[in-house]
Amino acid sequence: PYLDARYQIHGLSSPFAKLPSLDLYRELKPLKGLLKLSRMNQPSMESFLGITERNYCDGGACIRLYKQFASGKKPEAAEIVMGHNQEDLLGLGKIFSMLSYLALFNEDYEALNCEIQDDQLAFTIKTNYDLPVEFSNHSEEFYIIGQNNRVRLLVKLQNGRLKQYYSNYKDYDYIPSEDTAIPKTLSACMDKKLRRPAKRDNCYTWFPVTEAFLHDPLKQKTYLKHCLPYYLSVLK
């Protein structure tokens, strides 16, 4: 977009007009909480990837140098500005590898194993892409760690049961006395005092973790399809 705008300002036709484009930072935005990124910018992402060495100045200093170069006051600044831009481009190439983490959001994985460990259910899944850097994160009822193409998920059990979350929470009512959600089409006949509109964090039902579930990767994948988006969304 920036180069297209510069071509337009100078009355030139842009060679990029017919090329497909990708807003990399927008694509990676869902990863902010999962990977504990302080900001969705290039320095934060490079820091996550372990890229710490740069030979040229940062963006703020580079802008000041560019203005001095453009005004003719400091022609030697061109080398520094070009060097900074080169490092930015090389860094972007490495940041592209972070797209592999989106496999968790796009259901681009397969369930390999599922077992009960104390009061938790442990899932092991295989992503279709290698993850560039090991990561881990957790919430009150969920823990996740990933390395290479393996991700391990630990979900809290309650009396041998799991919560099954639903993303279309506006179509559900939450029943406090039952600690469960039911479709509004069914709750409409209930006393209004017994129900309230469901929210994202209480739109769930419960199901028992059976031996059949523990040995059925398809059922495990179905569960993760419904619930993993919620668990990922609450990470910070």
Give residue ranges: language-model regions:
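DEDD superfamily 3′-5′ metal-dependent exonuclease/proofreading module
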Residues: P1-K236
